[in-house]
């Protein structure tokens, strides 16, 4: 058997991604950049607020009891947004559906009914939910 060239002409170039540990990895060695949670999670500092979820009406929207909601009051509410609303003296978080007849506050749990909102209600969309912070361990 005669030896053959593996590649004819120029050999191809491959990306070199860096070293890979064969022992215990050091998390600090793979840091490429630092993450500032404040700049990631808060667009409008003066109009951003935090709420803790109390209840289970939004569980199918991944808003579970005890989660922290980041709510931005500077954002314009839109049809289908998840928002903290002020309804007849109380705060609630729901999906907001806007129509010519008013609004419908839709829960994300089939055990709860949608809440129709009309001119007789004291109602406002207080702020749009931009992030949900979850705790993954007990």
Listing of model-derived features with the role each one plays in the protein:
Residues 1-59, 90-91, 98, 131-138:
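Short, positionally conserved secondary-structure boundary motifs
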Residues 7-8, 12, 98-138:
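Glycine- and charge-enriched low-complexity intrinsically disordered segments
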Residues 42, 74-76:
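Short polar/acidic secondary-structure junctions
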Residues 49, 79-93, 97-103:
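Short, compositionally biased
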Residues 60-61, 69-70:
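Charged, well-structured alpha/beta interaction segments
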Residues 66-67, 81:
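Structural motif
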Residues 71-72, 86, 132:
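Residue-level recognition of conserved beta-strand edge/terminus positions
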